[in-house]
């Protein structure tokens, strides 16, 4: 990951004395130092270069200390703790010449830290969940965090690795929804992405990769999710759920339609449906699976009929339920 993301800035060069090259540019003037988090680790030696053609009269300071750290166009620092990260500024007299921010990415015993995000379900390995309503190449990813302040997320995505194809993602936004896990409330962030040259009918051979960069104060982490669109399909619920009496007492004919967001033509992108009847005592009847958009069921007063949809030809996720009370 480090070598793939390394960007060398010829204007304001930041490099590492270590041959591991464990520093890279996250965005302009923001750098991530990848650090072994162990008491015996000597730390990483980093050389910062001031963005100026001048050579003399330059001093360096940081937000962690009010003292002058050094003078000259370059400053060598040893990064070992979070106290060594933060903003570094070079000045000449009272003029700020350039400023850069160092973030730390912790590696403990060969495992990168994952402290910022929270799993909704312990058995789920992914901290980032992605879903698509259809095969248009548009999908939504979301994640949870308990952190309220000083947290920022950015998202990038592509399909394939050797010759990556473009996927455009918007800005991560905070949802009004709050999720409770083990009596604790978590905030939910989400992002919308669109494959640039999606072909809904084409067979997928290369997965899409989504990378979420997370920054909390001076800590950096990243989270990667890789998938095929067919694996993350979750249709919207069926629409226009209706009932009409049948000739047989206490039976009704239930009808519905494909959701508007589902791919067309429906003869090619077909759905299958699950139908359940819930009585007053909230006991489920046997589940009915049908491919058509109607079914006749026994429906006593006070019961509820629910219908959900799934891709007919691929074992992806079921939609949420569409529900209607029996007359």
Curated annotation (Swiss-Prot):
Q: Which GO terms describe its molecular function?
A: cytokine activity; cytokine receptor activity
Q: What does this protein do?
A: Cytokine that can act as a growth factor for activated T and NK cells, enhance the lytic activity of NK/lymphokine-activated killer cells, and stimulate the production of IFN-gamma by resting PBMC.
Q: Which UniProt keywords apply?
A: Cytokine, Disulfide bond, Glycoprotein, Immunoglobulin domain, Secreted, Signal
Which sites does the entry annotate for glycosylation?
A: 134, 152
Q: Which InterPro entries match?
A: FN3_dom (IPR003961), FN3_sf (IPR036116), Hematopoietin_rcpt_L_F3_CS (IPR003530), Ig-like_dom (IPR007110), Ig-like_dom_sf (IPR036179), Ig-like_fold (IPR013783), Ig_sub2 (IPR003598), IL-12 (IPR050676)
Q: Which SUPFAM superfamilies match?
A: Fibronectin type III, Immunoglobulin
Which parts of the sequence belong to the Ig-like C2-type domain?
23-106
User: According to the UniProt entry, where is the signal peptide?
Assistant: 1-22
All copies of the Fibronectin type-III domain together span: 237-327
Q: Of which family is this protein a member?
A: Belongs to the IL-12B family.
Q: Which cysteines are joined by disulfide bonds?
A: 50-90
Subcellular locations according to the entry: Secreted
Q: Record's GO cellular component, any one? A: extracellular space
Assembly and interaction partners: Heterodimer with IL12A; disulfide-linked. The heterodimer is known as interleukin IL-12. Heterodimer with IL23A; disulfide-linked. The heterodimer is known as interleukin IL-23. Also secreted as a monomer. Interacts with NBR1; this interaction promotes IL-12 secretion.
Name this polypeptide is given: Interleukin-12 subunit beta
């Amino acid at each position: 990951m480090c070598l793939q993301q390394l960007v060398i800035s010829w204007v304001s060069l930041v490099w590492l004395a270590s041959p591991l090259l464990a520093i890279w540019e996250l965005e302009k003037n923001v750098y991530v130092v990848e650090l072994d988090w162990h008491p015996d680790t000597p730390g990483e030696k980093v050389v910062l270069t001031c963005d100026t053609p001048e050579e003399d009269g330059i001093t360096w300071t940081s937000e962690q200390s009010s003292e002058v750290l050094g003078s000259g166009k370059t400053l060598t620092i040893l990064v070992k703790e979070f106290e060594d990260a933060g903003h570094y500024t070079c000045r000449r007299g009272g003029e700020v010449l350039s400023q850069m921010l160092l973030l730390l990415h912790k590696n403990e015993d060969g495992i990168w830290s994952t402290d910022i995000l929270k799993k909704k379900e312990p058995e789920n390995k992914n901290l980032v969940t992605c879903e698509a309503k259809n095969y248009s190449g548009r999908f939504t990813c979301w994640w949870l965090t308990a952190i309220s302040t000083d947290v920022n997320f950015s998202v990038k995505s592509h399909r394939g690795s050797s010759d990556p194809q473009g996927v455009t993602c918007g800005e991560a936004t905070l949802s009004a929804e709050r999720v409770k896990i083990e009596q604790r409330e978590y905030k939910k962030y989400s992002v919308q992405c669109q494959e640039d040259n999606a072909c809904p009918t084409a067979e997928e051979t290369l997965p899409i990769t989504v990378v979420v960069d997370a920054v909390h104060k001076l800590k950096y982490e990243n989270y990667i999710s890789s998938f095929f669109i067919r694996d993350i399909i979750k249709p919207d619920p069926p629409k226009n759920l209706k009932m009409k009496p049948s000739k047989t007492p206490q039976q009704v004919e239930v009808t519905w339609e494909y959701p508007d967001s589902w791919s067309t033509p429906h003869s090619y992108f077909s759905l299958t449906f699950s139908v359940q009847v819930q009585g007053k005592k909230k006991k489920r009847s046997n589940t009915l699976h049908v491919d058509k958009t109607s079914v006749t069921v026994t429906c006593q007063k006070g019961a509820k009929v629910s219908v959900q949809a799934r891709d007919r030809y691929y074992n992806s996720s079921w939609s949420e339920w569409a529900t209607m009370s029996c007359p």
